[in-house]
Amino acid sequence: MRKHLGGCWLAIVCVLLFSQLSSVKARGIKHRIKWNRKVLPSTSQVTEAHTAEIRPGAFIKQGRKLDINFGVEGNRYYEANYWQFPDGIHYNGCSEANVTKEKFVTSCINATQVANQEELSREKQDNKLYQRVLWQLIRELCSIKHCDFWLERGAGLQVTLDQPMMLCLLVFIWFIVK
């Protein structure tokens, strides 16, 4: 009786651990009711300023301070002026199926240079330290971006695809221990 009860508990724990309950969205009736919803602007009403914000390589400036090492002098300059620097880059170069990390980072840097050409050339005349910190920041922001399919190529277990295999493995181990 004790082993049977332990097996039931093991089965319950396995089902809870490997079920996709966390990915299920709880949806009520509110998503069907469209009361007090604002009408989305038509594409003819979109201004050039709005279009410029979402083009690939555009800077995201929200005033956040990032944890990046720029060297002693660069760190002091960044600490004092971090609000002037971007804290993100709009870029999604994952549309190509076989893009590598190096190619992705290079195209992100190139797109950022094209999108922000005016700001990069204007600031270049003013301050060399600003330029050095900005370019290092751009390289860092592009290198931390990733494509989801890179994770699928990795050696780790894919959670969604390997759940049945893990469940079978646990049941097999349970039968061996039993």
Swiss-Prot record:
Coiled coil: none annotated. Glycans are attached at N98, N110. It comes from Ovis aries. Disulfide bonds join C94-C147, C108-C142. N-glycosylated. It holds the Pfam family Doppel. Strongly expressed in testis. Detected at low levels in lymph node, spleen and ovary. A lipid is attached at G154 (GPI-anchor amidated glycine). It is a lipid-anchor; GPI-anchor. This is Prion-like protein doppel. Belongs to the prion family. A short helical region is required and sufficient for Cu(2+) binding. Residues 27-50 are annotated as: Flexible tail. SUPFAM superfamilies: Prion-like (SSF54098). Residues 155-178 form a propeptide.
